[in-house]
Regions:
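Helix-centric, low-specificity signal for extended rod-like, repetitive segments
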Residues: 12, 159-160
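Flexible glycine/proline-rich
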Residues: 1-142
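Short, intrinsically disordered C-terminal tails of secreted or membrane-associated proteins
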Residues: 162-167
Length: 168
């Protein structure tokens, strides 16, 4: 439908969860097409859509810096796509490790409730082994920062407009 009235800028991304996803443009309006699964939508919003909205608004958006965590699981994955695995951060002796939520399906809302964050597995990795380190993004820090920055941006940019409109 978008191709008939506008242009598809991209569709299909080499990520999991988060497929299918598309970005199009109709006249001067961007159209973001999201998958129907809740985990996919939540992660896409936090990691891709939110920064894109900031970019369109001319604001800077900085993703929180990940920390390195060793994984406490073995797993095979397809290469040529990045995967975000929901994990629980646990203390193991003197270090923290990442335990994978058992079911990683993109419809598993419980995986978000159980998890503390996500581990990002790069495209080139096909085997994940216990003890390997990967980038870990903490949900609490990440989502707090996303919503704090959004609210701060809205207050700075909308509050003067609202105040000035009431004076008229």
């Amino acid at each position: 439908v978008i191709n008939r009235i506008g242009k598809i800028l991209f569709w299909k991304a080499a990520i999991k969860p988060g497929r299918p996803v598309a970005l199009g443009k109709v006249d001067n309006c961007y159209v973001i097409c999201l998958p129907g699964n809740p985990v996919s939508v939540q992660l896409l919003y936090a990691l891709i859509i939110q920064p894109f909205i900031y970019y369109l608004a001319g604001a800077n958006f900085v993703l929180p810096q990940p920390e390195k965590l060793k994984v406490n699981f073995n797993m095979n994955k397809k290469t040529k796509r990045m995967e975000w695995l929901r994990v629980k951060k646990k203390k193991n002796n003197l270090e923290f490790i990442a335990d994978k939520f058992p079911k990683q399906g993109s419809g598993m809302i419980s995986s978000i409730a159980y998890s503390d964050g996500i581990i990002e597995i790069p495209e080139h990795v096909s085997k994940i082994k216990i003890g390997e380190s990967y980038d870990y993004f903490d949900f609490k820090i990440f989502f707090f920062l996303v919503f704090f920055l959004l609210n701060l941006y809205l207050i700075i940019n909308l509050f003067p407009v609202l105040v000035n409109s009431k004076k008229s």
